[in-house]
Amino acid sequence: MSVPTDRSYTAEHEWVLVDGSVATVGITEFAAEALGDVVFVQLPDVGAQLTAGEACGEIESTKSVSDLFAPVTGSVIEVNSAIDAGPETVNSDPYGAGWLFRVEIATAGELLDAAAYAALTSGE
């Protein structure tokens, strides 16, 4: 399982790549594999105000429906509209083209570095 070191992670299996005051958010390879084939993603609306730790969307797979949680507090400034037409991208490229949304950060949540996230998932 891949855990890129250039980003932070949450205990809910989301990754956060911060560039200045903007966080790009996606789910980890671990989450994508656990979900199975993703068939639908409900993303927050552009302009939505998110609070770190609160549910902000859903990912539906052939196995289950899982909540997406906001890793940071802030305002959604962009969503990956390509996910609507190709939700399987979340499985095939979770750390690249499968990103989900971008947030203008007001406050960062409790984030893990790559080593801490790898340790968390090694026991699951």
From Swiss-Prot:
<dbReference type="GO" id="GO:0019464">
    <property type="term" value="P:glycine decarboxylation via glycine cleavage system"/>
</dbReference>
<protein>
    <recommendedName>
        <fullName>Glycine cleavage system H protein</fullName>
    </recommendedName>
</protein>
<dbReference type="InterPro" id="IPR033753">
    <property type="entry name" value="GCV_H/Fam206"/>
</dbReference>
<comment type="function">
    <text>The glycine cleavage system catalyzes the degradation of glycine. The H protein shuttles the methylamine group of glycine from the P protein to the T protein.</text>
</comment>
<dbReference type="GO" id="GO:0005960">
    <property type="term" value="C:glycine cleavage complex"/>
</dbReference>
<dbReference type="GO" id="GO:0005829">
    <property type="term" value="C:cytosol"/>
</dbReference>
<comment type="subunit">
    <text>The glycine cleavage system is composed of four proteins: P, T, L and H.</text>
</comment>
<comment type="similarity">
    <text>Belongs to the GcvH family.</text>
</comment>
<dbReference type="InterPro" id="IPR011053">
    <property type="entry name" value="Single_hybrid_motif"/>
</dbReference>
<feature type="domain" description="Lipoyl-binding">
    <location>
        <begin position="22"/>
        <end position="104"/>
    </location>
</feature>
<dbReference type="InterPro" id="IPR003016">
    <property type="entry name" value="2-oxoA_DH_lipoyl-BS"/>
</dbReference>
<dbReference type="InterPro" id="IPR000089">
    <property type="entry name" value="Biotin_lipoyl"/>
</dbReference>
<dbReference type="InterPro" id="IPR017453">
    <property type="entry name" value="GCV_H_sub"/>
</dbReference>
<keyword id="KW-0450">Lipoyl</keyword>
<dbReference type="InterPro" id="IPR002930">
    <property type="entry name" value="GCV_H"/>
</dbReference>
<dbReference type="Pfam" id="PF01597">
    <property type="entry name" value="GCV_H"/>
</dbReference>
<feature type="modified residue" description="N6-lipoyllysine">
    <location>
        <position position="63"/>
    </location>
</feature>
